[in-house]
């Protein structure tokens, strides 16, 4: 006897268990918001012509999500990964060398772990 099981997915995009990439260009970060599964590492890629120093919010303490601080300084063409994001929460990030005003700027974003 052969039993086949099938399922339908719900709406929305599931969190990726394989990691996500955030790209930095002169226009800013893309995407500005990502959702990942616990234990995921996010890769930041600098495709801009200048360096960016990516850190966790808030500025200047950078202590909300220390796993983001492992990205650090990215020279043009470089990529670095966050540490394992294991705690379920939303983490803001920004370019430390171009700190955001209230409301953010083009080098800010959020990573949601769920």
Where are these regions (language model features)?
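Extracellular/periplasmic metallocenter environments
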Residues: 72-114
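C-terminal motif of bacterial Sec signal peptides marking the signal peptidase cleavage site
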Residues: 4-7
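Bacterial signal peptide processing site
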Residues: 9-11
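Acidic glycine-/aspartate-rich tracts in secreted/extracellular proteins
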Residues: 47-50, 58-62, 98-101
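Beta-strand-rich interaction surfaces with strong enrichment in secreted/lumenal proteins
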Residues: 32, 69-73
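Short beta-strand and strand-turn-strand segments in soluble, beta-rich domains
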Residues: 62-68
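Beta-strand cores of secreted/periplasmic/IMS beta-sandwich domains, seen most often
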Residues: 32-55, 79-87, 91-92
């Amino acid at each position: 006897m052969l039993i086949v099981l099938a399922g339908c997915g719900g709406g929305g995009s599931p969190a990726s268990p394989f990691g996500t990439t955030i790209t930095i260009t002169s226009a800013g970060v893309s995407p500005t918001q990502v959702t990942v599964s616990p234990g995921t590492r996010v890769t930041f890629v600098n495709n801009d012509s200048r360096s960016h120093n990516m850190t966790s919010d808030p500025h200047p303490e950078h202590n909300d999500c220390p796993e983001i601080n492992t990205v650090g300084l990215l020279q043009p063409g470089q990529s670095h990964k966050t540490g394992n994001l294991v705690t379920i929460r939303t983490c803001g990030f920004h370019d430390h060398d171009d700190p955001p005003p209230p409301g953010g700027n083009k080098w800010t974003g959020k990573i949601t772990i769920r």
